[in-house]
């Protein structure tokens, strides 16, 4: 059984947030608290150590008491850049990733992905959501083995940043969650208002 203590949680807060006008999304107020706090609160009981991937406002993020890891590639290279530094800093056998702007992330995310991982063997298990009869991949919500660093480094060296293409090189599986809203994220000011109003 994969215990929470053997999983490091990585909160991805290193994006450019162009559709939000370049504002650091992790620090945007959601019900009067920064979004990063919602991510921490929903993840902290599911994992052991927590890391925050951020590329600006480092002091503010560090103030939450968790190590902050910055991308090693320039220009806000996307979630795989965050995965890479998270894997390098990970000291447990597994790494669970989640974005900072999904304040309703499932409270059983780690447990369900870990159960599927044990059913494998798999290199990586990611979440999918069911909405209107369709299944949608949610690849930034994933549990991966911490020994994937070499694979990811080789992939990034090719200049590819597409998360789905890296997944195709691995033995992966997915877990379908019925609550699509659990993966709702904030990409625009309008989406922020809608999500706040829904709670």
Curated annotation (Swiss-Prot):
Where in the cell does this protein reside? Cytoplasm
Q: Where are the transmembrane segments?
A: none
GO terms for biological process, alphabetical: bis(molybdopterin guanine dinucleotide)molybdenum biosynthetic process
Reaction(s) catalysed by this chain, per the record, are: Mo-molybdopterin + GTP + H(+) = Mo-molybdopterin guanine dinucleotide + diphosphate
Any idea which positions bind Mg(2+)? Answer: 101
Q: Which residues bind GTP?
A: 12-14, 25, 53, 71, 101
Chief location category: cytoplasm
> Function, please?
Transfers a GMP moiety from GTP to Mo-molybdopterin (Mo-MPT) cofactor (Moco or molybdenum cofactor) to form Mo-molybdopterin guanine dinucleotide (Mo-MGD) cofactor.
UniProt similarity note: Belongs to the MobA family.
Name of the protein described by the UniProt record: Molybdenum cofactor guanylyltransferase
